[in-house]
């Protein structure tokens, strides 16, 4: 048996003393090794790549298994309760990357990260979860500073606090924020003196029993005392539990705590040391102190500089649409032969859809995992840009309402994306694509309302909670996939764009998207922002309520040319419930439906400033007490573009006829350079120019 303990030491200067914060990793060969590139390794990469999104989606703790013997493995990830989702996701993403890079062939490994703004853990192993409690694998560290108070009094208070926390952590169930990952967790603070606090944190993984949690924590406390008694802080990491304490708050674990009542007696601050014989400090002592402090500051500045350079390089690789190097996500790369085997060499019967730049196949990996394989067209120049954009972008996005990228393959002219397989096809299949009423009936109002909420959460993540602000630019029913439980997942990020810090809008000469879903400022001037996605989402909300396509409404008199104009007329005549899909008539909540229609109209207002942000939309949907603004008239702008694929070709807006057609939103007469009937016809035609979805539906 051989074990490699790998520690990342981060030095930082704090007012108390020089602190050593350690992230600990253990690569163990106790249960054997595997062949790099083999089935076990591929399973490991797949399941570890899923942890960042699954841990945040499952309230801070997730465990799962993949594959079959002898290549089956188990994995888990965990963050401390109260951790913000972005911090948790980023922490898990970092530790899983470390596991893949630094444990090349071990069948069991664990990484605890406690050096940032939160604490997280990821591990994998080839033994079932019923394994015995592992107390042998341990990492211990301590603060290099010594306590300057009376140790007898300190030990009494410290032991009282720690004993209380062991009991609390092995039996308590405290809930913080939206996270329910609170089993076997305790974070507490108490007074040592009038001006000094002590902070402590304990946590066990939720898969252990209360007695094992208690045993693990007690052993960790004993190990710390035996190693590091008298120090100003320290930690003990084990595969099933962690223990840390210090004289300052750490990892954001104490942000939500109310100050604990002080113990019955406090330690008194030691009196200042005076010595009549020491009237001056030796010059050598001063020089030594200055040198030490200077070295620490230099080390900190160097670490900061390296971090800034790395983040800049990372951003540049992420932002460039024409970058040739996608090795930043190399651990997601599949061998092209494995993809060919998974799809039976792209057998026609495995084809499940037609994407905007290629075909989509259903495949089964060697470990039994079903996947969706997007094979980009070899003849599409734009497809290569889309491919790079989607790999670099989607690999960094982890959310339960986004389709998860499992990997990619790149060899010669072959450009392939591998996604999680979503079994229930796309939303448009159920809303519009089936003549079978039972299919449409599967989307009752409760499911439709949940779908609206799920899309809201996914877009909110893209706009606000991801590392960069992401504009999807092609939100529509065919790009919303439904999982086995009819939960929505936003797909097709080939057109997505990212914003820099503090950037709120951008413009492009290559307008891409789908007529009827694009806001007027984007079609007319190429301007896009988060409010562009809001407009598209508003149209989609109205489609979900009505069960009809935006382009399916047309009257030759010009009074109605699409769904938005139709809804606006209903709204102004207090008859908005006439919009509701007959398939759900009599089985919906009128207040919820009316509110969704109201929100949809707020989203499609002509002025982007008037459209609500996704965070506001989320509040509107979850808090019925919020009063909604009165919607302003929706915006309509359609150019005379005779070819169905003009938007996909990336031509400049001024290359087209600038004659515009405006649909009537009230009883006023349409006045354009075109005839009234021709204007109405063109309005309808342009609003029906839909781009192809990731999954084209070909069956009922």
From Swiss-Prot:
GO terms for molecular function: ATP binding; protein serine kinase activity; protein serine/threonine kinase activity. SUPFAM superfamilies: Protein kinase-like (PK-like). The active site is at 474 (proton acceptor). It is found in: Membrane. Residues 307-700 are cytoplasmic. Residues 25-129, 135-250 form the Gnk2-homologous domain. The modification Phosphotyrosine is found at residue 522. ATP binds at residues 352-360, 374. It is a single-pass membrane protein. Keywords: ATP-binding, Glycoprotein, Kinase, Membrane, Nucleotide-binding, Phosphoprotein, Receptor, Repeat, Serine/threonine-protein kinase, Signal, Transferase, Transmembrane, Transmembrane helix. It catalyses: L-seryl-[protein] + ATP = O-phospho-L-seryl-[protein] + ADP + H(+); L-threonyl-[protein] + ATP = O-phospho-L-threonyl-[protein] + ADP + H(+). The chain crosses the membrane at residues 286-306. InterPro entries: GNK2 (IPR002902), GNK2_sf (IPR038408), Kinase-like_dom_sf (IPR011009), Prot_kinase_dom (IPR000719), Protein_kinase_ATP_BS (IPR017441), Ser-Thr/Tyr_kinase_cat_dom (IPR001245), Ser/Thr_kinase_AS (IPR008271). The modification Phosphoserine is found at residue 478. GO terms for cellular component: membrane. Residues 25-285 are extracellular. Glycans are attached at residues 63, 105, 146, 150, 191. It comes from the Eukaryota. The keyword Ion transport does not apply. The modification Phosphothreonine is found at residue 514. Residues 346-626 form the Protein kinase domain. Belongs to the protein kinase superfamily. Ser/Thr protein kinase family. CRK subfamily. This is Putative cysteine-rich receptor-like protein kinase 30. It comes from Arabidopsis thaliana.
